[in-house]
């Protein structure tokens, strides 16, 4: 009963939105009956873990045929669709720690995510005469711990990957932006995995590989996981859903430390635009406190390159196993990376054990001239996002005069347009967020957070060292400026804006939002010391009236 309550509480803590729930059900909910009937001869549905058998058994009465199928029959014809996750358990762990980890993995299996676990032991030296025995013992510990929580698990102590490139494959290294796996698989190698998943068991894999002489040798667990992620979709997805849906790295150190968060972990990483920058800003002391962080970062980039675009990787400490459930349901970081820094650090939302979520992500670019913009693609983005027809002629005529910069995510799947509006009082331009748009197909996949973080770095967060991101913008150099924007009072996105803004002002059918320049606030707080900031500072006097007047005079961009 205690485990059931813990399971339910873990789900409730995820606090999924309506979009999160729909996305989860689309991945794990019942499959259409017609589709299931057509594919049942070739698809293998991974059964859920067995429930505890009843104390006594009785003969099941014959169920008469009814015109309307009963819920039981309907559930049989429409089973919950199970997916697989590649899970790296990077020990060593104590029995108590391992118990916490495996409990979380069993909870995931109840929700439809079946783990393919690869075990590793950082403290076991390579080449030790007892290494094979120690590794196999560790595999058996994991199996026993899983079974203790009611799951069925199968140890796989033989090699299921082979060293070297796959026969017949070309060397694509020069064309890739990630390091390809140093291992590969052949269809017969994964018979143990297929068999375990078919039987409803969680496979627990040893980090062994076959060399060119067909000898089983110990390899890094990253090589096993990368090899599985690269070959599983093409070889096994038709027979069993082995194509990995998530990558989970469970270790003793937690996520990847960030220089922007005083050594606390990154919350969300856009691998396409941040990978090299993380390497460049990784401090020397972290190589001792988080020795496997960069190798796990490389593993995530390799695996996600082969996984579906909606997939993600999570790097989590053994102290935060419940966060795995939240990640599965929402596919989001534990805390949004676009929230204000003061809010994240002021109420202890961030801890050394906060997990890091990693996505393949999208490149982010900053343009300062209208001539650099692809107008056709930007038009399509704005019209799909807002559901309205853009008045292109007047819109771009205004940008020619007022544009400060445009941030573009990927191939125009998201954009933030900032203009310089006239301030009649001070004469200094007002930074105005004219448009913030993300394609509906990319809402919920992290693009919104990637875009807002870049917007922060170019406007109200400018001047901080952590705003020096390589996206073609100001590189963190300059003075931050207040950012202002408006939104319809009935816009459902306003709740998201409330969380990220410094304040808001209702203006009839509109709401005016703003974000204060963070560096100026920091300087003022330091100048006043323990007295803190007053309710209304001198430099705040009259600015809301000025902003409201300037924003109210901006013409509509729509037909």
Curated annotation (Swiss-Prot):
Its main location: mitochondrion. Its EC number is 2.3.1.1. It catalyses: L-glutamate + acetyl-CoA = N-acetyl-L-glutamate + CoA + H(+). Gene3D superfamilies: 3.40.630.30, Acetylglutamate kinase-like (3.40.1160.10). Coiled coil: none annotated. Keywords: Acyltransferase, Amino-acid biosynthesis, Mitochondrion, Transferase, Transit peptide. GO terms for biological process: L-arginine biosynthetic process; ornithine biosynthetic process. It holds the Pfam family NAT. One of its GO terms (cellular component) is mitochondrial matrix. Pathway: Amino-acid biosynthesis; L-arginine biosynthesis; N(2)-acetyl-L-ornithine from L-glutamate: step 1/4. GO terms for molecular function: L-glutamate N-acetyltransferase activity. Residues 162-188 are annotated as: Disordered. Residues 362-538 form the N-acetyltransferase domain. It is found in: Mitochondrion. PROSITE patterns: GNAT_NAGS. The keyword Nucleus does not apply. InterPro entries: AceGlu_kinase-like_sf, Vertebrate-like_GNAT_dom. N-acetylglutamate synthase involved in arginine biosynthesis. Belongs to the acetyltransferase family. This is Amino-acid acetyltransferase, mitochondrial. The gene is ARG2.
């Amino acid at each position: 009963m205690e485990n059931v309550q813990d399971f339910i509480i873990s789900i409730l803590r995820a606090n999924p939105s309506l979009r999160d729930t729909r996305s989860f059900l689309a991945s794990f909910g019942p499959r259409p009956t017609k589709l299931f009937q057509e594919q049942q001869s070739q698809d293998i549905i991974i059964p859920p873990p067995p429930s505890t058998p009843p104390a006594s058994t009785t003969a099941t009465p014959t169920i008469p045929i009814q015109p309307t199928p009963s819920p039981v029959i309907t559930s049989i014809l429409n089973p919950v669709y199970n997916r697989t996750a590649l899970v790296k358990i990077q020990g060593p762990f104590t029995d108590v720690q391992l118990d916490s980890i495996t409990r979380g993995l069993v909870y995931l299996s109840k929700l439809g995510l079946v783990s393919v676990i690869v075990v590793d032991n950082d403290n076991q030296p390579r080449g030790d005469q007892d290494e094979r025995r120690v590794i196999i013992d560790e595999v058996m510990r994991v199996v026993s711990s899983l079974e203790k929580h009611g799951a069925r698990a199968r140890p796989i102590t033989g090699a299921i990957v082979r060293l070297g490139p796959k026969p017949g494959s070309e060397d694509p290294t020069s064309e890739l932006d990630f390091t390809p796996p140093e291992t590969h698989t052949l269809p017969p190698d994964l018979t143990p995995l297929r068999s375990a998943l078919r039987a409803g068991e969680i496979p627990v894999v040893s980090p062994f590989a076959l060399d060119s002489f067909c000898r089983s040798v110990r390899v890094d667990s990253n090589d096993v996981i990368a090899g599985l992620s690269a070959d599983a979709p093409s070889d096994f997805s038709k027979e069993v859903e082995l194509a990995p849906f998530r990558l989970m790295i469970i270790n003793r150190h937690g996520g990847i430390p960030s220089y922007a968060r005083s050594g606390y972990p990154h919350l969300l990483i856009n691998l396409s635009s941040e990978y090299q920058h993380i390497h460049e800003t990784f401090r020397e002391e972290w190589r001792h406190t988080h020795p496997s962080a960069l190798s796990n970062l490389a593993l995530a980039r390799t695996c996600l390159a082969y996984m579906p675009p909606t997939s993600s990787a999570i790097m989590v400490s053994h102290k935060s196993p419940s966060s795995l459930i939240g990640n599965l349901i929402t596919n989001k970081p534990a805390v949004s990376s676009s929230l204000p820094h003061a809010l994240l650090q002021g109420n202890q939302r961030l801890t050394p054990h906060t997990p890091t979520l990693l996505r393949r992500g999208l490149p982010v670019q900053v343009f300062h001239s209208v001539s650099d913009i692809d107008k056709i693609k930007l038009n399509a983005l704005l019209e799909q996002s807002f559901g309205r027809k853009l008045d292109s002629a007047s819109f771009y005529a205004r940008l020619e005069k007022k544009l400060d910069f445009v941030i573009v995510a990927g191939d125009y799947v998201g954009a933030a347009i900032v203009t310089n509006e006239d301030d009649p009082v001070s004469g200094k331009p007002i930074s105005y967020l004219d448009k913030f748009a993300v394609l509906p197909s990319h809402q919920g996949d992290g693009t919104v957070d990637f875009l807002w973080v870049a917007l922060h770095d170019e406007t109200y967060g400018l001047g901080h060292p952590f705003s020096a991101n390589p996206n073609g913008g100001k590189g963190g150099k300059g003075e931050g400026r207040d950012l202002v924007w408006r939104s319809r009072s009935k816009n459902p996105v306003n709740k998201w804006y409330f969380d990220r803004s410094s304040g808001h002002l209702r203006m009839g059918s509109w709401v005016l939002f703003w974000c204060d320049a963070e560096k100026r606030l920091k300087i003022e707080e330091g100048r006043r010391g323990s007295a803190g900031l007053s309710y209304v500072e001198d430099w705040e006097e009259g600015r809301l009236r000025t902003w409201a007047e300037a924003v109210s005079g901006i013409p509509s961009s729509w037909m």
